[in-house]
A protein has these predicted regions:
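Alpha-helical interface subdomain recognition
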Residues: 1-82, 185, 194-344
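FAD-binding core of flavoproteins
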Residues: 83-89, 96-216, 220, 342-344
Length: 344
């Protein structure tokens, strides 16, 4: 196992760092957050599609670039670093699932960005779920029983998000549109479960990028802010938690990359690693952003300061997928087997 990046992978990371650095400015993030669909920048989405992002993880015979999960994780990390107000994780996993199912006709408009397809990460009818991209998605892939279904958005459903602290286009679909069964049986369920694990890994990558940027914001503030006659970064109570955060984030990033490798190479522990990556990234990003906000003092809670954008999303982006503490039970189940009477 080599977790080092190839030249092509470094180029992917640099390209998307440049895109998000230019197009996902704090001003654009704030503007998207205040829009009715909350957390969606249509112009950024268009540029994201034009650069080929939506086809990175899709097989070449379906019109994609034949990339792996690691390439998508690199994109997600850069998106998280800039709080990019576009759907990254669920849409990427949904596109890969359509590719596995060889749904080339459905994939066409998805790869151009003209149709946004998300993934309902909990099994059951779409009408019973709060969808992370519900305010902007044109269609949703879901698991209903043993069937993978493609559910379209009804025309009468308004594109209005539920208010939330994470700047997410959260919305329920109480009355979904037309439903098409794409696959049925055990293989269909396995394919869908794999897609959900890919969301786990990509959400972890988003959180790693988010927290890395938050640590940078906090440490730069600590260098210039003075108290009691010296810069606060000189105090160990300020500096040491930043060092701990950087170390933990390096570990979280490596765990994300290992999970990507395990899933792409079909390792037996791939599912456990995916859950580990999400749980650890969620915990690490929350602690890192909390310290960065704390260092700002009262200013950290003011909307004029960027750190509050990161602090709010650190918890909300994780919670939108799952409770990180309960995710540890998923890790245990996948490592040791489900809980049974009398223990594991």
């Amino acid at each position: 196992m080599d977790l080092g990046l190839t030249r092509e992978q470094r180029a992917v990371r640099e390209a998307f760092a440049a895109l998000f650095g230019k197009q996902a400015t704090p001003q654009r993030v704030r503007r998207a957050e205040s829009s009715p669909s909350t957390g969606f920048d249509g112009l950024l989405w268009r540029h994201y599609a034009e650069i080929g992002a939506l086809g990175i993880g899709v097989p070449s015979d379906c019109g994609g670039a034949d990339g792996g999960l690691l390439e998508l994780a690199l994109v997600a990390e850069e998106a998280g670093r800039r709080l990019a107000p576009i759907p990254v994780a669920e849409t990427a996993a949904a596109a890969r699932l359509l590719g596995r199912l060889r749904e080339k006709e459905l994939l066409g408009p998805v790869l151009t960005g003209s149709v946004i397809v998300s993934l309902a990460t909990r099994s059951g009818p779409v009408s019973q779920q709060m969808l992370v991209d519900g305010a902007i998605a044109d269609a949703v892939l879901a698991l209903d029983g043993e069937s993978v279904v493609y559910v379209t958005r009804p025309d009468r459903l308004p594109k209005t998000a539920r208010r939330n602290l994470g700047g997410l286009p959260l919305a329920p679909w109480y009355a979904p549109g037309a439903t098409t069964v794409l696959a049925e049986g055990g293989e269909a369920r396995t394919a869908f479960d794999t897609a959900v694990d890919e969301v786990r890994v990509l959400r972890a990558a988003l959180l790693v990028g988010l927290a890395s940027a938050a640590v940078g914001i906090g440490s730069r503030y600590a260098i210039v802010r003075e108290a009691f006659g010296q810069r606060i970064g000189m105090y160990q109570a300020v500096a040491h938690p930043f060092a701990d955060a950087v170390t933990a984030l390096d570990g979280a990033q490596l765990l994300v990359h290992k999970a990507c490798w395990a899933m792409d190479s079909g390792q037996d522990d791939a599912a456990a690693l995916a859950a580990m990556a999400f749980a650890f990234a969620a915990e690490t990003s929350y602690h890192a952003t909390t310290h960065s906000l704390h260092v700002h003092g009262g200013y950290g809670f003011m909307e004029e300061y960027d750190i509050q954008l990161y602090y709010r999303r650190a918890k909300a982006w994780a919670a939108a997928f799952a409770d990180p503490r309960r995710e540890l039970l998923t890790v245990a189940d996948r490592l040791f087997g489900p809980v049974t009477t009398g223990g594991r």
